[in-house]
Amino acid sequence: MTDMLTGTRRARVERKTKESDIVVDLDLDGTGIVDIRTGVPFFDHMLTSLGSHASFDLTVHATGDIEIEGHHTVEDTAIVLGQALGQALGDKKGIRRFGDAFIPMDETLAHAAVDVSGRPYFVHTGEPDYMVEFTIAGSSAPYHTVINRHVFESLAFNARIALHVRTIYGRDPHHITEAQYKAVARALRQAVELDPRVTGVPSTKGSL
């Protein structure tokens, strides 16, 4: 939530289930300082990219049943990250609200668009069919690219934002995945940024 005395937009969210134990600290007005430890190396890499390119200060410490499969840890972390984002936004006064970004990564081009609307919605298009079955190896737990959709959907619904993510073209599953995360990061950076010309909530209804 927004601290009325300091103006900082921060949140700390903890979530513990039988499958995972997750703590997320988020500062929307940070400088891209990140500390990510989920036990799934490629997911750590993606969240590091997200925090860095959004210029958020982001700490994620997660443990889970990765000896079975990393899915629970990854999806549950996205849930908590979305909750932290929603809380940190507070009343949403003064934000730009909308953001979008095109991100190229070698042969891949991805696009993300965000509306901090308070109406959760998610659209995910363009990934090649083989992404459903592809696995990116890791030293402790692999990352299955089929979960990309679940990550962004969980983030959107728990942050209560509208998020559209599309792969315009691409071939390498690593590049496709990373370009999507970076596009989401840059779109979020725009959308949550404070606009000096906006003093209230950026909605004709007066609330988001």
Swiss-Prot record:
Instruction: Name the keywords, alphabetized.
Output: Amino-acid biosynthesis, Cytoplasm, Histidine biosynthesis, Lyase
Q: Would I find Amino-acid biosynthesis among this entry's keywords?
A: yes
Q: What is its EC number?
A: 4.2.1.19
Q: Which cysteines are joined by disulfide bonds?
A: none
> Key word Lyase present in the record?
yes
Give the matching Pfam families: IGPD (PF00475)
- InterPro entries according to UniProt: IGPD_sf (IPR038494), ImidazoleglycerolP_deHydtase (IPR000807), ImidazoleglycerP_deHydtase_CS (IPR020565), Ribosomal_Su5_D2-typ_SF (IPR020568)
The annotated pathway is: Amino-acid biosynthesis; L-histidine biosynthesis; L-histidine from 5-phospho-alpha-D-ribose 1-diphosphate: step 6/9
Catalysed reaction(s) here are: D-erythro-1-(imidazol-4-yl)glycerol 3-phosphate = 3-(imidazol-4-yl)-2-oxopropyl phosphate + H2O
Identify the PROSITE patterns for this entry.
IGP_DEHYDRATASE_1, IGP_DEHYDRATASE_2
Location (main, coarse): cytoplasm
Tell me where it resides.
Cytoplasm
Q: Quote the cellular component terms of the Gene Ontology held in the record.
A: cytoplasm
What are the protein's GO molecular function terms?
A: imidazoleglycerol-phosphate dehydratase activity
Which GO biological process annotations does it have? L-histidine biosynthetic process
Q: What is the similarity comment for this entry?
A: Belongs to the imidazoleglycerol-phosphate dehydratase family.
The name under which this protein is listed is: Imidazoleglycerol-phosphate dehydratase
Gene that produces this protein = hisB
